[in-house]
Amino acid sequence: DASFSFSLNNTSTQSSFNGTQMKEDKTRASLDQMGFVYTQKVSNRNLLRYVNFGFGYHKSKNFNRLFSMGGVLDGLSQSWQLSGDLNDAGINGTDFDNILDDKNPYGAYFNREKYSILSMMALRTGVVDWNPEYDAEYKGEDNIRKIPVLGWDGERNNFYSEEKGGISEYDFSIAFNLGDRVYLGATLGIYDVLYDRFSSYTEDLIGYQATDERDNRIYSIPVEGDQAVSNGGYTLDNYYRLEGSGVDLKLGAIIRPFEESPFRIGLSVHTPTWYELTETTNAVLSSDIMAFEAPYQENLSNYLTPLYLTYDYRLSTPWKFNVSAGTTIGGLIALGAEYEYADYSTSRLEDLEGFQLGDQISVEKFLNGVSTLRVGMEARIAPSFSLRAGYNHSSAMFKDDAYSALAVYRTSTDFNNVKEKDT
């Protein structure tokens, strides 16, 4: 026997931000599965009746998604957050000038307790700027003079993300029929992983220009009489790729305990999937801010070797256990129930030498055991018409206090979390 199937996958998302509605809609064709089974009859009398050999391909995960959101900012801007990061880190004029002028500041001045990568990129592109009124010794009531680095007010923003890829699984199977009562099977699975994510965040900025004889510059903070003017903007592009391969083994049995009954019990165990993966990241911050004479661009790959932007590691998923039961009634109704459990806190993260990674502590602390319950029924109403209904409940993989701990040189801020859900 041989089979294959195609599908059309439609991705549609909608967003609302400060009164602005946005929608993304895209349809892609996909080869979801194909396979064949060769059956060898052994005997009608012996315990072993049939041996089946199979090969299958299916796309176990499809990552294709689109999302966009944007609207009016009313003065809010990420640039103020980035200037706040620098100020909170205790930046001074010397460090500001060194970061601005250094050929590669991301190694010399960066550490987790000082300046973030993204805030330094913002400094070098004018997304934040030194406050000319700053006075470290000032003790008066003008708070602006106490702030070393300033941001810009925002007018509008736009966020867009596109995800591509999937997990393709290639299965090599063998199964045995023992007396038409017990069915045993084993499957070797080989996985091909590819996930690409591109996200882009843009802000249009506002500046303030003097209407008197003061000068013609554009300032971050207005004084009385200044007028708001368009001040250009900036775009932060983030690139992320995950690729690799994996292997696992699945063992299962279906048992018919009663010879004259269609009732059956299923048991299966899946070994961990052992993955070897590579993550690659990059970020580009481009600005064209009217307060400055020229546009600027910072591309991390121009400063950092692949050693900093590429990460190789091994991941092993948890053991997975499954029990199921099903039967038919009168040849018209089929009933089934299934329970599955996997403890994701037992997942393992190692480097290519087999040593445990530092993130392993977070895996054990923030991941849960996941229980999945599925029940379903199908009723044949007419020879060519059936009704099917089902219920699926999955508990949350992440604990409530889990957070996204990005790699050092990741500047993306989007976060995905699978909560408890029913379908």
Where are these regions (language model features)?
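Outer-membrane beta-barrel porins/channels
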Residues: 32, 37-423
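Surface-exposed strand-loop-strand hairpins of Gram-negative outer-membrane beta-barrel proteins
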Residues: 10-27, 242-244
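Transmembrane beta-strand segments of Gram-negative outer membrane beta-barrel proteins
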Residues: 1-12
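Short secondary-structure boundary/capping segments within folded domains
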Residues: 1, 25-26, 44-45
